[in-house]
Amino acid sequence: MYFILRNLKLTYIFHSGFAVEIHSCILVFDYWMDPTICLPEILSKGKPVYVFASHFHGDHFSREIFAWRKLYPNIPFVYILSRDIVRHHGCHRDEADILMVKGDGWCDKIIKVIAAGSNDSGVSWIVEVEGKRIFHAGDLNNWYARFLIPKT
């Protein structure tokens, strides 16, 4: 399933995973699995790919992302990960290009990234690219539903 808004294509991958396609690059957030097999078509477009993982939980991070560099050798990949992924042994420091914690910022010629807070593990992401600001919440949740259940 995807939506196109003002030169931005947003594709739902699975769970908290999304891909954002814009003119200059592709952003992939919190990849876990791809049951509809939509990513090969997205990743094969020849654009730089920025891969974000908000935290170490298995439903927000998969080591499978590191294989993409070998599967698509002519495409530049930048892995931007929450530092807790290394701390919890999800990956080695040298596998990530950028490691971030809440409050960190990073940019290159294409994107600007800020790691914001989460009320669960890791971070949420604010990404600025081509005059657009994109927010991915990671595991950020207001947990409002617990207040809807009457106490017994």
Language model regions located:
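Pre-active-site segment of Zn-dependent metallo-hydrolases
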Residues: Y2, G17-W68, L140-T152
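Metallo-beta-lactamase
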Residues: Y2-R6, N74-K132
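Active-site-proximal beta-strand elements of phosphoester/diester hydrolases
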Residues: K9-Y12, I26-D30, I110-S118, R133-D139
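Generic beta-strand structural signal
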Residues: Y12-I13, E21-I22, C107, E128-V129
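Conserved positions at the start
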Residues: H15-G17, G122
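Structural beta-sheet core signal
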Residues: V51, Y79, F135-H136
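Internal alpha/beta domain cores that form substrate/cofactor-binding pockets in large enzymes
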Residues: S121-T152
